[in-house]
Each structure stands twice: as C-alpha cells, then as structure tokens.
C-alpha cells in the first residue's frame, strides 16, 4: 500500500482524491479505484501526532488512460455520505492553471459541488472540483463558491451566460475572483491572458464547445431552376402551388406550345396537278406525287414516337388529311375507311349521331395535351347508371293495343231451398 518516493511515481498516471471521510482507509481506497483499472499503489498522508489521514490521498494506476477513466467515473461520487473529488495530481494542475478563476455568489444552501460541476462543465474544462465555502462548525454553505477553468475562453463564456441566471430559484452572480496576493485586483487581466496564450500546456487542453457542431437551421427550398438559368418554372408548366391550367378546346393547342409553321409554297407542277392544298401529304415532300404512309393507324391514335409538333402539323382529327381539297382542285379525296369500320359521314335520317371513332378519347377530337398539363378528370356517371331510355328503331310504328283479357270469376255455388220459419 505504501508508495515510494514522489520522484519515482508516474505523475501522469496518478490521481488526487480529496474530500475523504475519516473512516476511509488505504485498503478501501485500493478496492474502490480498482474498478477503474489496475492500481499500482495508494498513498494517504497522515498526521504524525494523531495518526489519522488528512482527508485526501493519491492513487497511481498502471497507465494514463486508466487514470483518465477513473476521473470520469469516480469524480463526485459519495463515499460515506461525502462527495469525493478526483482529478489529476496537483503538480499537473499547477502547470495548467492560467488564472481563469471565477466567483459565484448568492448560492442556495441546497446547491452542492456536484450541481455546480455539472452546470459549469458545459462551458469548458474545469481543473479542480468547484469549491463551496462552508462553515467549519456546521458544514453549511456560506452562499458562494469558486471554479477554476483551464482557459479564459471557458471562463468568459460562463460569466456571459450564467451571470444573473436563476439556479435553484435564486439569481446567481458570476464574475472573476479576486487574487490572493494582491488587494482589489481580479483574475482575467491582460497580463494573465498573455501568459495563458504563451503556455503550451493550456493550448493543448482547449475547452470543448458543446454546440459548436450543431447543424445549421433548415432554409427555404430553392425554386426549380430551368435550363434558362432562372428560378421560374419552364414554359407551359404551372408555378408551384397553383391550380392546373384548363383543358384546351377541341382543335386548339395547349398553352405554352407554339403553333405549327405553315409549309412553304410549292412551285407549279412539282409533284401533282397544280399546287397541293394545305395539309395534303405532298405539301411536305416536293417532287413526290404520293407521300409516306399515314402517320396515324386506322382508329385515330398516333404513333408512340410522334411529338406534339407533329400532331399539331397533321391536324386535330387524328387523320392524315384533315383539309383535303374538293375533287378537281388538285387535292386528293379523303381515304375510305377499311371494311367493317363506320363511315365518317353523317348518319342516316332519324338515327342518332355517331360517337367518336374507336381509339379516340371521348370529348377530345383533337390531340391530347401532354402529360402533367391535363385538367381534372371528367365526371363519370355513378355505378349502375345505364343512361336515358333508348328511342325505338327508325320506322317502327306501334299498332293498336289488344283488348284486355277478361278475368275469369270463380263459379258461384247453387243456392238451396228456402227454409221455413224457425220453430218457436
């Protein structure tokens, strides 16, 4: 248990233990700190007259990492009802002491060293356990304490943040403490700050910043940047948060799509009998009497590879020749539908008008607007609704109604002979 000379100790692996009760012995101190790591030796200075220890001791560990771990887990724990102070040896603390000592006044009597350590350790490294001045007879707090920080940055932050704050329902006062060797001069002078800046040990143990690595507050999302480099949405697209544009009328182009340019005029005799009419197949391919196959298959649906500009050029009706000229004017007559398909002409007299051809959308004879620019979907009839009653076929004449069939009556039973008067 007995320690060797101080010069033979590993000061970096030795911790100072203060605030020990008189019942604490070296074997108990050995077993207590053995939980933090392997202990080399323990030493508790004793009074030569009484033979009792003076309330503090030293514990040497096998490595410096074990000593640092013991300081973290053993500091301010209670032993026999008293919180013990565990930190590095005093020789090491003297090298780190730069004079950043603060005074804390108007403390509540219930505040102990543990509460002060937990409160002020958020601002930086504390070299020694906070010292609360107590009455030697009763042990009650006198209402003020001292804290020694490892840097002036930590002490400045503690004074700025905690001065005037409430701690246990009392506003505390935090300022630099007075120096012991001079009257009326406080710590934190320019000379002390200059010496602290030149101390390499104090620069190695910089105080930690609790909220220095906090993420920045979330900012507003940036608008969509188009290919033009501005914050406006692309042409034809509604701005964020607005309603979709209305559905364009049949035959009209959706907003934002430029109209198709008319084809250049053809010289006479370049592929037909006279200049072709607008919209004919020969208008876009001079020198050919017959153009390429129709861009739309029978049924009115365009090819998947066609763009919106080609749809606008070929017309809104889904046919390859929307504006064919009359016979004899140089244009070609409209093509006849394949067998089995209804003729696009007017219906016979008395018949209801035909609906749109198979494959074309209801109510939209023109090209469909591009995806993302359509309006709300059309209202659909409720489930089970069959529509109004159909009219009778054309030429049907209802004849006179047949007479109602007589309902047979049940036979009446024959009546018997009349009875005479009842006997008296």
From Swiss-Prot:
<feature type="region of interest" description="Disordered">
    <location>
        <begin position="207"/>
        <end position="424"/>
    </location>
</feature>
<keyword id="KW-0507">mRNA processing</keyword>
<dbReference type="GO" id="GO:0005684">
    <property type="term" value="C:U2-type spliceosomal complex"/>
</dbReference>
<dbReference type="GO" id="GO:0071005">
    <property type="term" value="C:U2-type precatalytic spliceosome"/>
</dbReference>
<keyword id="KW-0007">Acetylation</keyword>
<keyword id="KW-0597">Phosphoprotein</keyword>
<dbReference type="Pfam" id="PF00076">
    <property type="entry name" value="RRM_1"/>
</dbReference>
<dbReference type="GO" id="GO:0005689">
    <property type="term" value="C:U12-type spliceosomal complex"/>
</dbReference>
<keyword id="KW-0508">mRNA splicing</keyword>
<feature type="domain" description="RRM 1">
    <location>
        <begin position="13"/>
        <end position="91"/>
    </location>
</feature>
<dbReference type="InterPro" id="IPR035979">
    <property type="entry name" value="RBD_domain_sf"/>
</dbReference>
<dbReference type="InterPro" id="IPR052084">
    <property type="entry name" value="SF3B4_spliceosome_assoc"/>
</dbReference>
<dbReference type="GO" id="GO:0005686">
    <property type="term" value="C:U2 snRNP"/>
</dbReference>
<dbReference type="InterPro" id="IPR034159">
    <property type="entry name" value="SF3B4_RRM2"/>
</dbReference>
<dbReference type="InterPro" id="IPR012677">
    <property type="entry name" value="Nucleotide-bd_a/b_plait_sf"/>
</dbReference>
<feature type="domain" description="RRM 2">
    <location>
        <begin position="100"/>
        <end position="179"/>
    </location>
</feature>
<feature type="modified residue" description="Phosphotyrosine">
    <location>
        <position position="56"/>
    </location>
</feature>
<dbReference type="GO" id="GO:0005681">
    <property type="term" value="C:spliceosomal complex"/>
</dbReference>
<comment type="function">
    <text>Component of the 17S U2 SnRNP complex of the spliceosome, a large ribonucleoprotein complex that removes introns from transcribed pre-mRNAs. The 17S U2 SnRNP complex (1) directly participates in early spliceosome assembly and (2) mediates recognition of the intron branch site during pre-mRNA splicing by promoting the selection of the pre-mRNA branch-site adenosine, the nucleophile for the first step of splicing.</text>
</comment>
<dbReference type="InterPro" id="IPR034158">
    <property type="entry name" value="SF3B4_RRM1"/>
</dbReference>
<comment type="subunit">
    <text>Component of the 17S U2 SnRNP complex, a ribonucleoprotein complex that contains small nuclear RNA (snRNA) U2 and a number of specific proteins. Part of the SF3B subcomplex of the 17S U2 SnRNP complex. SF3B associates with the splicing subcomplex SF3A and a 12S RNA unit to form the U2 small nuclear ribonucleoproteins complex (U2 snRNP). SF3B4 has been found in complex spliceosome 'B' and 'C' as well. Component of the minor (U12-type spliceosome) spliceosome. Found in a complex with PRMT9, SF3B2 and SF3B4.</text>
</comment>
<dbReference type="GO" id="GO:0000398">
    <property type="term" value="P:mRNA splicing, via spliceosome"/>
</dbReference>
<feature type="compositionally biased region" description="Pro residues">
    <location>
        <begin position="388"/>
        <end position="424"/>
    </location>
</feature>
<keyword id="KW-0747">Spliceosome</keyword>
<keyword id="KW-0539">Nucleus</keyword>
<feature type="compositionally biased region" description="Low complexity">
    <location>
        <begin position="222"/>
        <end position="231"/>
    </location>
</feature>
<dbReference type="InterPro" id="IPR000504">
    <property type="entry name" value="RRM_dom"/>
</dbReference>
<keyword id="KW-0694">RNA-binding</keyword>
<feature type="compositionally biased region" description="Low complexity">
    <location>
        <begin position="303"/>
        <end position="323"/>
    </location>
</feature>
<dbReference type="GO" id="GO:1990935">
    <property type="term" value="F:splicing factor binding"/>
</dbReference>
<dbReference type="GO" id="GO:0003723">
    <property type="term" value="F:RNA binding"/>
</dbReference>
<feature type="compositionally biased region" description="Pro residues">
    <location>
        <begin position="232"/>
        <end position="268"/>
    </location>
</feature>
<dbReference type="GO" id="GO:0071011">
    <property type="term" value="C:precatalytic spliceosome"/>
</dbReference>
<keyword id="KW-0677">Repeat</keyword>
<protein>
    <recommendedName>
        <fullName>Splicing factor 3B subunit 4</fullName>
    </recommendedName>
</protein>
<feature type="compositionally biased region" description="Pro residues">
    <location>
        <begin position="332"/>
        <end position="381"/>
    </location>
</feature>
<feature type="modified residue" description="N-acetylalanine">
    <location>
        <position position="2"/>
    </location>
</feature>
<dbReference type="GO" id="GO:0005634">
    <property type="term" value="C:nucleus"/>
</dbReference>
<comment type="similarity">
    <text>Belongs to the SF3B4 family.</text>
</comment>
């Amino acid at each position: 248990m007995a320690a060797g000379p101080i010069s033979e100790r590993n000061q970096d692996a030795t911790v100072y233990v203060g605030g020990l009760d008189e019942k604490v012995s070296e074997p108990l101190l050995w077993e207590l700190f053995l939980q933090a790591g392997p202990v080399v030796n323990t030493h508790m200075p004793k009074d030569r007259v009484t033979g009792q220890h003076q309330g503090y001791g030293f514990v040497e560990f096998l490595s410096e990492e074990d000593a640092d771990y013991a300081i973290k887990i053993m500091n301010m724990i209670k032993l026999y009802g008293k919180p013990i102070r565990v930190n590095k040896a005093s020789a090491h603390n003297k090298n780190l002491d730069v004079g950043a000592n603060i005074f804390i006044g108007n403390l509540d009597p219930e505040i102990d060293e543990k509460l002060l350590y937990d409160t002020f350790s958020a601002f930086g490294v504390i070299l020694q356990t906070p010292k609360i001045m107590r009455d030697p007879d009763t042990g009650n707090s006198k209402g003020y304490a001292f804290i020694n920080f490892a840097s002036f940055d930590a002490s400045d932050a503690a004074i700025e943040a905690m001065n005037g704050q409430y701690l246990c329902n009392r506003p505390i006062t935090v300022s630099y403490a007075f120096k012991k060797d001079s009257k009326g001069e406080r710590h934190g002078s320019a000379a002390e700050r200059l010496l602290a800046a030149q101390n390499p040990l104090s620069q190695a143990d910089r105080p930690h910043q609790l909220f220095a690595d906090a993420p920045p507050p979330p900012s507003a999302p940036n608008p969509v940047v188009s290919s033009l480099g501005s914050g406006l949405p692309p042409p034809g697209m509604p701005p964020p948060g607005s309603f979709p544009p209305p559905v364009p009328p049949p035959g009209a182009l959706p907003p934002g799509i430029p109209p198709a340019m008319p084809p250049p005029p053809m010289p006479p005799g370049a592929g037909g009998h006279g200049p072709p009419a607008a919209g004919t197949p020969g208008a876009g391919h001079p020198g050919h009497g017959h153009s390429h196959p129709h861009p739309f298959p029978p049924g009115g649906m365009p090819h998947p590879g066609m763009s919106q500009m080609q749809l606008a050029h070929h017309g809104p009706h889904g046919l390859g020749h929307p504006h064919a000229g009359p016979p004899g004017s140089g244009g070609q007559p409209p093509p006849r539908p394949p067998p089995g398909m209804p003729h696009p002409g007017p219906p016979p007299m008395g018949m209801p008008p035909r609906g749109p051809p198979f494959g074309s959308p209801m109510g939209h004879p023109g090209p469909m607007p591009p995806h993302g620019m359509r309006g709300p979907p059309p209202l659909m009839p409720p489930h089970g609704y069959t529509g109004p009653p159909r009219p009778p076929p054309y030429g049907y004449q209802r004849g006179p109604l047949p007479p109602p069939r007589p309902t047979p009556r049940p036979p009446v039973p024959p009546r018997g002979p009349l009875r005479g008067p009842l006997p008296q």
